[in-house]
UniProtKB/Swiss-Prot annotation:
<dbReference type="InterPro" id="IPR003593">
    <property type="entry name" value="AAA+_ATPase"/>
</dbReference>
<dbReference type="GO" id="GO:0016887">
    <property type="term" value="F:ATP hydrolysis activity"/>
</dbReference>
<comment type="similarity">
    <text>Belongs to the CbbQ/NirQ/NorQ/GpvN family.</text>
</comment>
<keyword id="KW-0067">ATP-binding</keyword>
<dbReference type="GO" id="GO:0005737">
    <property type="term" value="C:cytoplasm"/>
</dbReference>
<dbReference type="GO" id="GO:0031411">
    <property type="term" value="C:gas vesicle"/>
</dbReference>
<feature type="region of interest" description="Disordered">
    <location>
        <begin position="22"/>
        <end position="43"/>
    </location>
</feature>
<dbReference type="InterPro" id="IPR013462">
    <property type="entry name" value="Gas-vesicle_GvpN"/>
</dbReference>
<comment type="function">
    <text>An ATPase that functions in gas vesicle formation. A minor component of the gas vesicle, also found in soluble extracts. Gas vesicles (GV) are hollow, gas filled proteinaceous nanostructures. During planktonic growth they allow positioning of the organism at a favorable depth for light or nutrient acquisition.</text>
</comment>
<keyword id="KW-0547">Nucleotide-binding</keyword>
<feature type="binding site">
    <location>
        <begin position="72"/>
        <end position="79"/>
    </location>
    <ligand>
        <name>ATP</name>
    </ligand>
</feature>
<dbReference type="InterPro" id="IPR027417">
    <property type="entry name" value="P-loop_NTPase"/>
</dbReference>
<keyword id="KW-0304">Gas vesicle</keyword>
<dbReference type="Pfam" id="PF07728">
    <property type="entry name" value="AAA_5"/>
</dbReference>
<protein>
    <recommendedName>
        <fullName>Gas vesicle ATPase GvpN</fullName>
        <ecNumber>3.6.4.-</ecNumber>
    </recommendedName>
</protein>
<feature type="compositionally biased region" description="Polar residues">
    <location>
        <begin position="22"/>
        <end position="36"/>
    </location>
</feature>
<comment type="subunit">
    <text>Forms homodimers, probably interacts with other GV proteins including GvpA.</text>
</comment>
Length: 357
């Protein structure tokens, strides 16, 4: 695949992520509704053929009325892609982040406070008529607002919420009806707006704080698997986000991709690691080469922690894996004077080890 630089209208992101404006909360018929986000273009996003393909496939399901689900490991850009696709729909966006403490009331709404009314009638001077009423105040939450107004709902990492929380979604996607709890009083259900769309993301490889998705919900979702971006996309993103020369960014990208391909880690190094190294190197003016001890230290700080999750690893195994990482640095970020000439065991290795504590 070939990559392209950011176009005149680069990828769209949402106001809640550093750009755009938010529509403030409002009261509607005694209800309080949460604010929605307005999509707007953002510079620094590179749209490659891979992104365009995923966007086209996702919009195909959404335009047909199906909820979309982007599934993939950490660092594959699921959330960014979901926000980009949502922006293409041209509707306000409401975002929910999955959480174990999230309940149905957090999606639909609940009674929040009371509205008091007191009338004192003294039309007849020696007779006082007193009338007092107290009504509970209903507050719409994100799902209800999106269904009522026809907004786009982005539910990020939805498997972090308990499965029973999502029972209310089954009727939304199948019957296009949102059933409200009895406390709502005014209405027991609402008809889902025809423009309502939903986009989910999840990480199937995560195991900490994640619940299995219920079959009834998974069966209603159109799932697209998102893999790690190809080299062309990583290179284009790194160059656009950091302003680094493409040749220097390519060295960092190739280093991290080789480290990921080695499998010699406990936490997978993703494109975030490449961007971390490239951004710091660009800001600090480092030479992307094994000749610069500060750059070598930067790579060590960003990548070595992924080899071991704690201090229990045996010293021998630790040193072996560190040596393998340093060999990759020598290979993919070689000396500028003699590119790729110094291999493991040579003078560059001594320079690498001398740069590290």
């Amino acid at each position: 695949m070939t990559s392209e630089a950011a176009s005149k209208d680069p990828i769209s992101v949402l106001s809640g992520f550093g750009a755009g404006t938010a529509t403030s909360a409002s009261k509607n018929g005694g209800r309080t509704t949460p604010s929605a986000l307005t999509p707007r273009p953002r510079s620094g996003f590179v749209e490659t053929e891979q992104v365009r393909d995923l966007t086209r496939r996702g919009l195909g399901f959404l335009n047909a009325g199906y909820p979309l689900h982007f599934r993939g490991p950490a660092g594959t850009g699921k959330t960014t892609l979901a926000l980009h696709v949502a922006a293409q729909l041209g509707r306000p966006v409401i975002i929910i982040t999955g959480d174990n403490e999230l309940g149905t009331a957090d999606l639909v709404g609940s009674q929040r406070g009371y509205h008091y009314r007191k009338v004192v009638d003294q039309f007849i001077h020696n007779v006082t008529k007193l009338e007092e009423t107290a009504n509970q105040h209903w507050t719409d939450h994100r799902l209800t607002t999106a269904c009522r107004e026809g907004f786009t709902l982005v539910y990020d990492e939805f498997t972090r919420s308990r499965p029973e929380t999502h029972n209310v979604l089954l009727g939304v996607f199948e019957e296009r009806m949102l059933f409200l709890p009895a406390q709502a009083r005014e209405e027991c259900y609402i008809k889902v707006h025809p423009e309502f769309r939903a986009i989910f993301t999840s990480n199937p490889q995560e195991y900490a704080g994640v619940h299995a998705s219920q079959d009834a919900l998974a069966d209603r979702l159109a799932t697209i698997d998102v893999d790690y971006p190809d080299r062309a996309m990583e290179l284009a993103v790194a160059s656009a986000r950091t302003g680094m020369a493409e040749a220097s960014a390519a060295r960092i990208i190739d280093l991290v991709r080789a480290f990921r391909a080695s499998g010699d880690y406990q936490q997978t190094p993703t494109m975030r690691a490449s961007l971390m190294i490239a951004r710091v190197a660009a800001l600090e003016g480092l030479d992307v080469s094994v000749d610069d001890p500060r750059f070598v230290q930067l790579c060590s700080d960003a990548l070595e922690s992924r080899i071991f999750s704690g201090q229990r690893a045996e010293a021998v195994a630790r040193e072996q894996r560190r040596a393998a990482l340093y060999a990759l640095i020598e290979t993919y970020c070689p000396s500028v004077a003699k590119p790729r000439a110094r291999r493991a065991g040579g003078g560059a290795r001594a320079g690498v080890e001398g740069a590290l504590p």
